[in-house]
Structure formats: structure tokens, C-alpha cells
Amino acid sequence: NKSLKERATIIQRRLIADDRGWFLKAITGTEEGIPTHTGEVYLTMGKFGQAKGGHYHPEAVEWFTIIEGSAILKLEDMETHERLDIEMSLVKAITVFIPNNVAHVVVNNGDKDFILLAYTDKLYDPKDTITYEIKG
């Protein structure tokens, strides 16, 4: 039998940071022992007064949950251009499902940084992330 030290795995992750905040993938979908069909679990932080996102995915769907701070999730359907703003915070304790072809941006509307926990059903593909600015 293998020891716990041999069976447990510590995986170094890459923290990506810029003026708006930071981004960290917790599960990339390529880990040993992960099911063959998976997506990605990630955390992202948005600094006070900043927005994160501003894109849509033709293929992937996502689920967003704020785990610290508060934000407005702005959505726009790329086919109908219907728009929806959703207030999110730890106090509200909601998870929002974002269908494919729906543009999304998360705008910090609080007095401190927000942290968002997200899941996407696909592995990251830059061809499936189309920049789009939701106006207003």
C-alpha cells in the first residue's frame, strides 16, 4: 500500500493578477484521477470599483457564486439582446447559471473586493471566449 504522502497530491497553481484583481483556477480538468468529462472550477477576485469579464462563450456554460463582497452580474443574450442585472453577495447566497451565448460582466458594487467562485462545463479554450462590452 502507498503511504498517504504518496497518494495525496499538492498541485502548484498559477495566480494571474492585474489592476482589476486576480484569477486562480482551482480545478483545471487535467488533474490525474479527474473524470473524463469535466470542466473547470475557479476563483476570481474583483477589486473595489472594477469589473471582471466582458465576454460570452458560444459553447461553455458557467455557474457563478459570490463568496465574499458584493457585485452586480450583468447579462446580455447575444441573440435577443435581452439584458438582466442580478445583485450578488454572500448574504444573498445565490448561484447564477449562465447559458452559452450570454455575455457577462461582474461589476464590484461594494465597498471592498469581491471573490467569485465559478464552475464552467468546458476546459478553457480561447476560441470559446468572445470579448463583448455590455453597455450601461
Regions of interest found by a model, annotated:
Residues 1-95, 111-136:
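Non-catalytic, conserved peripheral segments adjacent to functional cores
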Residues 106-109:
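Asparagine-centered strand-capping/turn motif at beta-strand->loop junctions
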Residues 93-103:
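Conserved SET/PR-domain catalytic core that frames the SAM/AdoMet-binding pocket
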